[in-house]
């Protein structure tokens, strides 16, 4: 049996705490599913790597990540690393570039329906919200040619996209929609009424779906009206939300507040679909929140986003969807209110008193029952 190698990058401040929680959960999966052998290898990134090696990401760590079947990251950054030429965040940017991950997946849903009351939006507006933002990660205006203001009072950014860049992420979004049960609609967010690149996106995506995925529903939505829908009637975006780098950056952050706490949400960055690509597929997962130095070491951080990131690692990095679903079900049971048969455990970000260890222990216990 060939073990699946997972590189573990705890990172800074709360990073080691939340990664430890996710590892406990993954080790239950390995124990209960002996056919899924996991091998963990820990490395440093961010401030921890700066302190140890003088750089936020070593070549050795990059090599390990490229050879791995998946990478589990905690969080990077903190106020103590002030050298602008050697910032912890530079390590993460370099890692993403080295791994060649071009698609970022950010689910927006409620890990338990009992969490609806914690949303800043009214329950009747957010109940049933369930979509995944698929953001193109390596193209667009963040990577185009630019002209800085040199005192002339003029600056410029360009917004380039190629047919290949748009096509590959359109097919990944279609795959996500196809593998949903039932198949999910895909909504393309763009600004095709103004931007040439958006018209390329709309034309390319429409052609691919018509020729290769005629059974899937494709909708077009202008990004400005989508931002409005996200707070007015977010369920209209349910399914897969496909968009470019800049629009995805903004809309995924807007969506992240819907579930009520950043501590609940996972993300995955991919270089393709396992089993669908001739080349090795890289998978980097991490919670969407930062390193939270103010609560580090207190044992009160919410580990759910990182535990669910481990679920995404199983689903998209190791092609183990059943085990991923088991983790999600265990988390749901822990967060479900006692009135519907759950444990009703919440950390302080959700107004509860449960510690990081309490949540982790409960998820482990529920997962052992499910598996």
Curated annotation (Swiss-Prot):
Residues that, per the record, bind substrate: 96, 106, 135, 224
Cofactor note (record): Binds 1 Mg(2+) or Mn(2+) ion per subunit.
Cofactor dependence: Mg(2+); Mn(2+)
Database matches in SMART domains: Iso_dh (SM01329)
Residues binding Mg(2+), per UniProt: 224, 249, 253
Pathway linked to the protein: Amino-acid biosynthesis; L-leucine biosynthesis; L-leucine from 3-methyl-2-oxobutanoate: step 3/4
Site-annotated residues for Important for catalysis: 142, 191
Positions bound to NAD(+): 78-89, 290-302
Keyword annotations from UniProtKB, A to Z: Amino-acid biosynthesis, Branched-chain amino acid biosynthesis, Cytoplasm, Leucine biosynthesis, Magnesium, Manganese, Metal-binding, NAD, Oxidoreductase, Phosphoprotein
Keyword ATP-binding set for record: no
Quaternary organization: Homodimer.
Its biological purpose: Catalyzes the oxidation of 3-carboxy-2-hydroxy-4-methylpentanoate (3-isopropylmalate) to 3-carboxy-4-methyl-2-oxopentanoate. The product decarboxylates to 4-methyl-2 oxopentanoate.
Protein name: 3-isopropylmalate dehydrogenase
Organism from which the protein derives: Schizosaccharomyces pombe (strain 972 / ATCC 24843) (Fission yeast)
Name of the coding gene: leu1
